[in-house]
Structures are given as structure tokens and as C-alpha cells.
Amino acid sequence: MEELLSKQREECKELQSKITNLRKQLKEGNKKQKRALQQKISQMEADLSQKHATERQKLDKGDEETNETQQEDLLNTLLQQMEDTKITTAEKSSVQSSLNTKENTPQQPKKSRNRQKERLERRKAEMKKMSEQAELESEKMADLKNEEKKKFSKILEEAGLVAVDIPADGNCLFASISHQLNYHHNVKLNSQALRNKSADYVLKHCEQFEGFLLDEESGEVLPVSDYCNEIRNNSKWGSDIEIQALANSLEVPVHVYNTEGPVLKFNPSTVKFEKPLCIAYYQHLFGLGAHYNSLLYRDN
């Protein structure tokens, strides 16, 4: 457990360092680009918290199975080491006395055994505390998910919209826009085609996006060419950057409904299709992170 906690503390320090660098970038750029950075920061924090909770739960289960044999294993290991190094009988007797040997000086073994028991009890208490913390974090995630569902239900009811479920496979943004294009404008473009379109636009208008193209794992700013390559060839999640790129390249408005504020409207510089594409942005629907669904009007 000590080793895991040390590793997790280091990971937290690394994350805070990355977040500090990202927050410096929040002072620049437009409102939508700032929102994309803030979403990325929140997602990085949530992902690390969930990762740590899972690691602690796994270690907790493993330690419960091994604690019962720790004392016996420790005794056997030390005695074997004494045989291997051929220490004297007097030295061996001294070590055995400190390791709960009832035959020699009964008071000393009792004291050593009690100290070991206390260490185990402290460790169990710490593990229990960490397990309870993991459960609280899990309950918190469930509460956030339920609260988001309630808010979205009210928002969509008032707007006369209904959500169309899109698979959470890393392509949800592109799949949602693909569904909207086909439904409203009879334009058939799959997720890969939309990935290519957004990457082409970002690459062509790189001056609009430089400094806001982030690596999902490190949170560091990527060169435009590297970022576009990830959008094309990997299941990199789409964000506000891709939404704006697609709105401009497809010449269609995109409206993003969310529970944190008003509808975000991504308007293209020139309009070919007047009817906007409507999608929903979820932060807590899935434990994996952000998710998008397609939205349709009930009277359609």
C-alpha cells in the first residue's frame, strides 16, 4: 500500500504541474477554446481520481488474502537468510529471540509479536480508510451521473428534443454529427470521413488553433501535424475544436446542449445548410469521460 500511495502522490504532482501549464493557456484564446481547455483539465482530474480509486480497491482485495501469512513468511525468510550466511549459533539465537521464539526469553518474542501486530492493524485501518474513500468517490460519480440525467431531462423537455443514443466508442462526436447530417440534410458522411474533414480544416487554418491542440495523456500542446494525425488515425475524442472545424467545413451551424450553461452555438463563416445540427454533451454519463448524443425534435 505504501508503494502505491507513493506512486499516486507522484502522479498527482505530475498532473498538477500539467494543469498549471494548461491554466496559463486559459488567459489566451477565445471563449470556446478556453472552454475546451477547461473541459480537458476536468477530464484529466476525473480520470486520475477514478484510476487511483480502482488501484486502491484492487490492492485492498489482494492484501486481505496475503496479510494472514505475512508473519510466518517473514520468520521463515529471516531464518533462511541466517542459514545461507552461516551466522553463529549465538547470533541465530539472538535473531530468533527477536522473532517471537518462545523457547528463549519469552518476554522479548511477545514484544516483537505485538509490534508486528500493531503494524498490521495500522495497515488494515489505512486500507479500510482508502477503501471507504474509493466507495465515496464511486458514489459521488453515481450522484453526478443521476444529477446530470435529471438536468438534461428538463432541458430537453423544454426544448422539445429527445436524445438518440450513440455508442461510446471514441467516435461519439463524429457519429452524432453524422446522424444529424443524414437525418436533416441527407448528407451521408461516416465518422472517419468527418475525422478527415476536421483534420483537414485544422491543418489549413492552424493559426486559429495553435496552442489549444492537446495530447490526451500528457495534456501537453501538440504540433498541429501531430494532432491532426491523431484525429485521422486514432480514436481520439472530438472536442470543441473539431465541432468548430466541422461547422466551418460543412457550412452548417452546430448547437451543443449541456447542463452547465446555455446552448453553445458554433456558427460557420458561410452557411450552406440553415437547419442546425443539434447534439448533447455529457460529462458524467459514462465513467470513461465526456460523451455526445444526437438530438431530434419530438415532432419530427
From Swiss-Prot:
Reactions mediated catalytically: Thiol-dependent hydrolysis of ester, thioester, amide, peptide and isopeptide bonds formed by the C-terminal Gly of ubiquitin (a 76-residue protein attached to proteins as an intracellular targeting signal)
Keyword Iron: no
One annotated GO molecular function: cysteine-type deubiquitinase activity
Annotated segments matching region Disordered: 23-73, 89-141
Organism: Schizosaccharomyces pombe (strain 972 / ATCC 24843)
Role summary: Hydrolase that can remove conjugated ubiquitin from proteins and may therefore play an important regulatory role at the level of protein turnover by preventing degradation.
Annotated Basic and acidic residues bias: 48-61, 115-141
Superkingdom as given in the UniProt entry: Eukaryota
The protein's name in its UniProt record: Ubiquitin thioesterase otu2
Any single biological process term in GO: ERAD pathway
Root EC class: hydrolase
Pfam families: OTU (PF02338)
UniProt feature, compositional bias: Polar residues: 89-109
Keywords linked to the UniProt accession: Cytoplasm, Hydrolase, Protease, Thiol protease, Ubl conjugation pathway
Lineage of the organism: Eukaryota, Fungi, Dikarya, Ascomycota, Taphrinomycotina
Chain intervals with Acidic residues compositional bias: 62-71
